[in-house]
Amino acid sequence: MVFXLPNKNVIFVAGLGGIGLDTSREIVKAGPKNLVILDRVENPAAIAELQAINPKVTVTFYPYDVTVPLSESVKLLKTIFDKLKTIDLLINGAGILDDHQIERTIAVNFTGLVNTTTAILQFWDKRKGGPGGVIANICSVTGFNAIYQVPVYSASKAAVVSFTQSIAKLAPITGVTAYSINPGITKTTLVHKFNSWLDVEPRVAELLDEHPTQSTTACAQNFVKAIELNQNGAIWKLDVGRLDPVQWTKHWDSGI
């Protein structure tokens, strides 16, 4: 079912980052009713810019660190739901790339996303009388083909791809659908300088810069196309300016 952004209420976690900010720009152009940005660092200039792009959209900001306890995530979301009454789309976009920081990489890239998703299910789960909703999880192409010099980052993204697939299959029970957004190498600060695991390749950032890349604008435009297509369980690859579905190969089935 197509997801029409006009008049919708959207929460965007990390909506002020590289890909995040350009995606926020594209989202406000599409005319949702509310865009609620949750990010670790406030950027008043960016919020003002987003509001100016489309004055009919209400853009609000709440400080949010995805590594807080689950109870804190629930508390923040309750504040938002109390104000807006309904949320139609949650975008989970927080991420770091630094394999020196093993625990934080897992905490931000995976555990924080799981907790934010778990928190919003308190309000969306149809078993609790909720209306359901849609989740777009920003993962990475490294989630299905690792950059082996950054195995911690790659593994954290693979975990999110797997988690998203499970959430999608649970849609008949919860009423919540989900799909993953997997950008290829995109020109952001994330890939300009970062650390490989155990410094196995000190030049990994430089080497990646030699790989075909895409702009954050091109990635953001395809992100919005994926939002509008709204295919539950889709694994979208956003690479070199293209939007392509990834066909996942099933090697085993639990049978349950």
From Swiss-Prot:
The active site is at Y153 (proton acceptor). The keyword Aminoacyl-tRNA synthetase does not apply. It catalyses: a primary alcohol + NAD(+) = an aldehyde + NADH + H(+); a secondary alcohol + NAD(+) = a ketone + NADH + H(+). Substrate binds at S140. InterPro entries: ADH_Drosophila-type, NAD(P)-bd_dom_sf, Sc_DH/Rdtase_CS, SDR_fam. One of its GO terms (biological process) is alcohol metabolic process. PANTHER family: 15-HYDROXYPROSTAGLANDIN DEHYDROGENASE [NAD(+)], ALCOHOL DEHYDROGENASE-RELATED. Keywords: NAD, Oxidoreductase. GO terms for cellular component: cytoplasm. It is an enzyme of class 1 (oxidoreductase). NAD(+) binds at residues 12-35. One of its GO terms (molecular function) is alcohol dehydrogenase (NAD+) activity. The keyword Manganese does not apply. Belongs to the short-chain dehydrogenases/reductases (SDR) family. SUPFAM superfamilies: NAD(P)-binding Rossmann-fold domains. This is Alcohol dehydrogenase. Its EC number is 1.1.1.1. Homodimer. It holds the Pfam family adh_short. Signal peptide: none annotated.
